[in-house]
A protein has these predicted regions:
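Short, small-residue-biased leader/transition segments that mark boundaries at the very start
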Residues: 1-8
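ATP-grasp fold ATP-binding core
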Residues: 13, 39-59, 78-99, 104, ...
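Active-site "cap" helix and flanking loop/linker of ATP-utilizing ligase/carboxylase catalytic domains
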Residues: 146-167, 182-244
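Peripheral (often C-terminal) accessory segments that flank ATP-dependent C-N-forming ligase machineries
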Residues: 208-312
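Conserved ATP-binding module of the ATP-grasp superfamily
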Residues: 20, 62-98, 127-133, 152-157
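Short beta-strand-to-turn element immediately C-terminal to the catalytic PLP-Schiff-base lysine
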Residues: 26, 56-61, 107-109, 172
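Beta-strand scaffold of nucleotide-dependent catalytic cores
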Residues: 57, 67-70, 92-95, 101-122, ...
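Short, well-ordered beta-strand elements within core beta-sheets of diverse protein domains
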Residues: 57, 95, 196, 282-290
Length: 312
């Protein structure tokens, strides 16, 4: 459903008080100046039609608004990434909300929302690039209950039905705020690996059931109480250039808890850093399991201690 991926549908969610940050539509530099005046700073300027946290700019001062807007136009050109071709030159400016980031995975069938679980995420301070995700969430039940309650309100306000959804939001001092919803399953190995390997139940199977009209209400598994914590972690480059290799990559698979290593670059591939490109800096993805988030973080620290991304 394009209804949910179109960020303007937040207007529907805005009818539920406190559910999402204030925002304004931006099509020109003047629109941006007006939005900054109305909403204030800091704020987030981003394209309407994108995925994977692409094209996100944090606005903290009025001094470089024109430069930032021109950079946004250039870096979100459909020539750079076809994801921008669906809603070309359509942007929103929204209030920046401080807090930890989460996503919620589930399906909606016959207007009833079924939640598979909550994913704890981390993003880079600049450009909000997602580089790590843990499933299921470590948060206390009270927090998870609030996130789920607001997720259901958001989904129902959009009136989407008979599809999977992937909702993103942040936990602020004044509660959970919804940032965006896509009427599709999550990427980043969440749907394909993390949920299944953590819980022992296939989430994809239920997504297919919804798509073909099989009722999921009586057979909805418990995805959140498996005996393992799962994680995907992205190794990133920190400079532009030509990719040479990841020194130490061969040893990663020998570490207990590492399930898979997926290289994303071959020798000689160009690496372009944000904001010129938002996904080129990702060099490899690692899927890990452990007894806890802390357990997996220790494994990641071990990996980071001996690998080196070599860029020429």
């Amino acid at each position: 459903s394009s209804a949910a991926s179109d960020v303007y549908k937040r207007q529907a969610m805005s009818s539920v008080k406190g559910l999402c940050p204030n925002f304004q539509e931006v099509k020109s530099l003047n629109d941006l100046k007006e939005a900054v005046a109305n909403i204030g700073m800091p704020g987030i300027l981003k394209p309407v039609g994108a995925s994977g946290s692409k094209g996100i700019f944090k606005i903290e001062s009025k001094t470089h608004l024109e430069d930032t807007f021109n950079l946004l136009l250039d870096s979100t050109s459909p020539n750079k990434d076809k994801v921008y071709s669906y809603y070309p030159n359509l942007y929103i400016y929204e209030e920046y909300i401080e807090g930890e980031e989460f996503s919620v995975e589930g399906v909606v069938q016959n207007k009833e929302v079924f939640i598979a679980g909550i994913t704890d995420k981390r993003v880079t301070p600049k450009f909000s690039l997602e580089y790590i995700a843990f499933f299921p969430s470590d948060k206390p039940e009270k927090v998870k209950d609030e996130i789920k309650k607001k997720t259901k309100l958001a989904i129902q306000s959009l009136k989407i039905d008979h599809c999977a959804f992937h909702l993103e939001g942040r936990l602020t001092e004044s509660g959970f705020k919804v940032i965006e919803i896509a009427a599709r399953p999550a990427g980043g190995f969440i749907t394909s690996h993390l949920i299944r390997l953590s819980s022992g139940h296939s989430f994809i199977e239920k997504i297919i059931d919804v798509a073909i009209g099989n009722n999921v209400k009586d057979s909805w598994p418990d995805y959140e109480n498996g005996n393992k914590k799962l994680c995907f972690y992205s190794i990133r480059a920190h400079q532009s250039g030509l990719f040479k290799k990841i020194a130490g990559l061969d040893f990663i698979m020998e570490i207990p808890g590492v399930i898979a290593v997926i290289p994303l670059k071959e020798e000689g591939d160009e690496v372009i850093m944000p904001p010129q490109h938002f996904s080129s800096c990702f060099i490899a993805n690692i899927i890990l399991e452990g007894e806890s988030t802390e357990d997996i973080e220790n494994t990641i620290d071990e990996i980071e201690s001996f690998i080196k991304v070599e860029i020429q």
